[in-house]
Amino acid sequence: MGTTKMVSLLNHSLNVTTKDGRTFVGQLLAFDGFMNLVLSDCQEYRHIKKQNVPSNSVYEEKRMLGLVILRGEFIVSLSVQGPPPMDPSMRGSLLSGPGVARPAGRGIPLGQAPVGLAGPVRGVGYTAPPPPAGFGRGAPPPGFRPV
């Protein structure tokens, strides 16, 4: 698929089949040149055959995965399952709930650090010792004789 076609599929609900037979259904958030896909609200469907039963009984196992990155190397087919959700500006207004968005207070005033994390108090204790003396600037190390 060309990138123009893939760009038109952004936010659509896709049905992606992989080499091992699994099917992933989710909303396309992103893709790259290697055909790696990022799907949100993804569900995985697997067809499982029962080993002990002689008849060809196959059942489908479904599990909710959430946000998934599918490697393009393993993708066999890609089909559109549904259109993108309604306008993003309307979608945000529908999801808001009661209350006011503000950070949760943790009981610590903003201007102060906790007691153990405050650091040393000025004027208490000794100063730091001086750094160790070096060899001097530009002088060769001991035992080295310039030519």
UniProtKB/Swiss-Prot annotation:
**What CDD domains does the database record attribute to this sequence?**
Sm_B
Q: Which InterPro entries match?
A: LSM_dom_sf, Sm, Sm_dom_euk/arc, snRNP_SmB/NAA38-like
One term of GO molecular function: snRNP binding
Q: Could you give a single Gene Ontology term from the biological process aspect?
A: mRNA cis splicing, via spliceosome
Instruction: Name the domain of life.
Output: Eukaryota
Keyword Nucleotide-binding present in the record's keywords: the answer is no
The record's SUPFAM superfamilies line, in alphabetical order, gives: Sm-like ribonucleoproteins
GO CC, any one term: U1 snRNP
Which function does this protein serve?
Plays a role in pre-mRNA splicing as a core component of the spliceosomal U1, U2, U4 and U5 small nuclear ribonucleoproteins (snRNPs), the building blocks of the spliceosome.
Its recorded name reads Small nuclear ribonucleoprotein-associated protein B
Which species does this protein come from? Schizosaccharomyces pombe (strain 972 / ATCC 24843) (Fission yeast)
